[in-house]
UniProtKB/Swiss-Prot annotation:
One of its GO terms (cellular component) is cytosol. Belongs to the Fmt family. This is Methionyl-tRNA formyltransferase. PROSITE patterns: GART. The keyword Lipid biosynthesis does not apply. Attaches a formyl group to the free amino group of methionyl-tRNA(fMet). The formyl group appears to play a dual role in the initiator identity of N-formylmethionyl-tRNA by promoting its recognition by IF2 and preventing the misappropriation of this tRNA by the elongation apparatus. Its EC number is 2.1.2.9. It catalyses: L-methionyl-tRNA(fMet) + (6R)-10-formyltetrahydrofolate = N-formyl-L-methionyl-tRNA(fMet) + (6S)-5,6,7,8-tetrahydrofolate + H(+). GO terms for molecular function: methionyl-tRNA formyltransferase activity. Keywords: Protein biosynthesis, Transferase. It is an enzyme of class 2 (transferase).
Amino acid sequence: MRIIFAGTPDFAVPSLRAAAQRHEVVAVYTQPDRPAGRGRGLTPSPVKLEAIARGIPVFQPQTLRSPEALATLRALDADLMVVVAYGLILPKAVLAAPTHGCWNVHASLLPRWRGAAPIQRAIEAGDTETGVCLMQMEAGLDTGPVLLSQRIEIGEQDTGGQLHDRLAALGAQVLSDGLGLLRAGIRPVAQPQPADGVTYAHKLDKAQARLDWAQPAQELARRVRAFNPWPVAEAILAGERVRLHGAVALELAHQQPPGTLLAASKQGIDIACGEGALRVRVLQREGGKAITAADYLNARRDLPALR
């Protein structure tokens, strides 16, 4: 089976490997190289690096809407296009080009968390489970019928990065199952998404990572987990801005204003919130690396009252 694969970040790499294992991936589409790192040099996407390692031709158009881009894609004569976190909108003509259309691996249980950041939004919202859907793509944003799906639990301490890796592996397995069925001549039954329960996972940005101590500690702890490893939660602690890599909520009654440091030990730094307190365990000062609360306290000798 001739497959076009379209994807860009790390999340898509296991799915590319799954597609290439038993099928002919005739081309990989990925985002153009972007400036990255301290030198801001052009950096290829993880999917591009994987494709090059496998000897698969790589295409990096700025858009798929041009007649030239469509002609190039059609000339590949693909049976199926698999899309995993590609980052470009596919026009209707592209969706209709392959014999079996376009499949998408999406990291949520649709219709919950359509959109760009389903993994982080699930943690942020306090969801206890999530999963992966293999979807037949249509013109709407993640609105297509679901072909296959798998569920997993979200652990109480799962970070965005940890859940990302588990779902990337699960997505590859679900895709492999779907491709196996199609190769055997069995087209997965397309189940329309229900009209109820639709939510949207809006794109992450650094501004959303700034914590407000007036919010409940439970909400803040979930955001710390969700935004690890990016964009990483940040807040004002003891008069300086820090990034929070690890924290837990405490059901602690207090009468202190939000943001007040309540206690500190090698177990963590307890900060008053609108409800309860947040115990910060791992944090990062500006220009530094992530350190434990104990190491932070050793560096902040100006806080004797907290020891």
